[in-house]
């Protein structure tokens, strides 16, 4: 019945997502020298959408002879407060230089140079060495544009403006065998039937009042894997970038002013004109890690020392207008578009939801704990621990995307394409079509409620009372989702897609809240007002969350200190 009514595309490798991870996975698999079919599915348009393209700052890699893998590793673990998966973090660090070389020599990327022709590397917060490779302040555009060109030049199939609605099981419920896909333009379903599936949609904490990711991001991959039964890790760890632009009355508030500004010397001030980071981080000041700077800014705002629009000021003019205009042309232009003069004056900024450190639990081959399912990029957890260093994000995506492509290409040969469960498909379609044409609640007030509640209860600072209240709000909103009505046809129905987004954001929000309740300490991006100190004795461990019989279940496990212990580097 299903095959007669819904188109089925058969493929060897299904890649959900077309950012740094998805494109690198496709290229590595295509270049593996094996005759395999590859299908990329993306909500946006390949090369034009997603978070990787939005990367401004750069890409961390050990290239200078005076730098070392061990230094980058220590910086990454200190930044992550030592709950990183050390095996994954080490893979990131040793493979990042390989990927930079590959992107330049094989894929056509070109990064900024020093006068001697070597790759220029700039300073970023939380790092002991200047190791951030960049293309001006528009690094992501360079990387994604070149990767997309390479994908178009190979025998790789792709579907733009299509979204995965749910991962599909085989009839025995033992393997993931693809996904149910919705053609966003036509409003019609198809089935991507696959031997192996990679989830790398990009995270997207857009369930907060202020957020940095592109509007098409809604924690899709994380929610898909969670509902399929995959284990998740570190979901309490949500990064808030310190400098999201405040644009009064605009939905673009939250868009980033990149970390390189602070790395180069930009300073932060409260409304009283005080350079407040001198109080919170006397040594590092504005170059402290993102969690420290965001929390410091937030505390200034809460204490009544914020700007008229609820932020703080960033002052880049202290570096000299000519320096700012030369080194940060993208940021200068963006601010000019909104009537702000970044090179000559102070600009209002606020902490903004930016990145999930948590995600699907994977091994060093990007395999999840579900047969046939891989994850990479922001959808995968464990690499960054409690806080991601700026510059490690796009490195993570391209490094582990490549690893996933290699792994899938090696493992797909001889793997049987087993039938999918048609009953599951019918049930999913019934669920997601339910709001169409139904008289009911308006979706958008529910979304506004979620964003405000998460900002206040599951945000930069937390406590038990607020977390419980936030989780209660999430449960109430989940109940109301069954009462939402969506008007209009199926074709290009933005409200229907926003309903699907909201469904995923609610699942991700619940995982954040439940995991945050369990961690009764403060560590990295997770700050508890009722437990303000780090507690290595009891909480040097990871929390895992898994859906069992329709309900979330929490597990915990001590961190595997396989390469480095906190005391080895004086981290107490």
Predicted feature locations:
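Short beta-strand to alpha-helix junction loop
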Residues: 84-97, 131-149, 159, 211-219, ...
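An anion/pyrophosphate-binding glycine-rich loop and adjacent beta-alpha core
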Residues: 224, 230-341, 345, 407-414
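Glycine- and aromatic-enriched mobile tails/lids
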Residues: 1-4, 9-11, 20, 28, ...
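N-terminal Rossmann-like FAD-binding beta1-loop-alpha1 element of flavoenzymes
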Residues: 13-40
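Conserved redox-cofactor binding core of oxidoreductases
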Residues: 104-188, 193, 200, 244-248, ...
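Conserved N-terminal glycine-rich FAD pyrophosphate-binding loop of Rossmann-like flavoproteins
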Residues: 44-77, 81, 239-243, 252-253
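Glycine-/small-residue-rich beta->alpha transition segments that form the dinucleotide
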Residues: 194-196, 200-205, 379-380
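Core beta-strand elements of the Rossmann-like FAD/NAD(P) dinucleotide-binding domain
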Residues: 8-11, 186-196, 369
